């Protein structure tokens, strides 16, 4: 099994327990979690909530995931932290600049997975997404360059 901890300015122990989780302080969540995944709205109190000090406090084997809002994490601080080995890895599908430029500090890092954000689920989005997947797989099968791949 897995122990799930949560933090929110509005979370109570009772609400967390009803979902099978334990509510902890933000600092405890950052320092003890194996996987830290952000699910917050972006606002004045959450912008750059994850910065250099939070990344430095994470476990060496932690994985940071942000599929919520780009501004929740300081991307430059995250890139520096990943190069320093804490957290161990990151996975993101939201970025301060989209499409992500090849000069972005996270592009090319071996311990980062960057994917496009599919924030709006509808048939046209999935048709485009699956068409892109088929195009990439076809190129790979025939030894051709992959379309839309970012590399440093």
Predicted regions and their residues:
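Conserved SAM-binding motif I beta-strand of class I
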Residues: 6
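Residues at the starts of beta-strands that form the adenosine-phosphate
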Residues: 2-3
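C-terminal helix-to-coil terminal segments
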Residues: 96-152
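Rossmann-like adenosine-cofactor binding region
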Residues: 9-105
């Amino acid at each position: 099994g897995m122990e799930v901890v949560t933090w929110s300015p509005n979370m109570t122990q009772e609400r967390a327990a009803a979902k099978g989780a334990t509510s902890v302080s933000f600092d405890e969540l950052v320092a003890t979690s194996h996987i830290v995944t952000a699910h917050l709205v972006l606002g004045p109190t959450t912008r750059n909530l994850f910065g250099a000090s939070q990344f430095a406090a994470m476990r060496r084997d932690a994985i940071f995931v942000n599929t919520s809002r780009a501004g929740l994490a300081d991307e430059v601080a995250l890139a520096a932290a990943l190069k320093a080995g804490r957290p161990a890895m990151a996975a993101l599908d939201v970025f301060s600049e989209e499409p992500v430029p090849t000069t972005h500090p996270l592009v090319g890092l071996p311990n980062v997975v960057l994917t496009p954000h599919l924030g709006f689920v509808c048939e046209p989005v999935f048709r485009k997404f699956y068409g892109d997947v088929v195009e990439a797989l076809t190129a790979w099968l025939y030894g051709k360059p992959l379309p839309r791949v970012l590399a440093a």
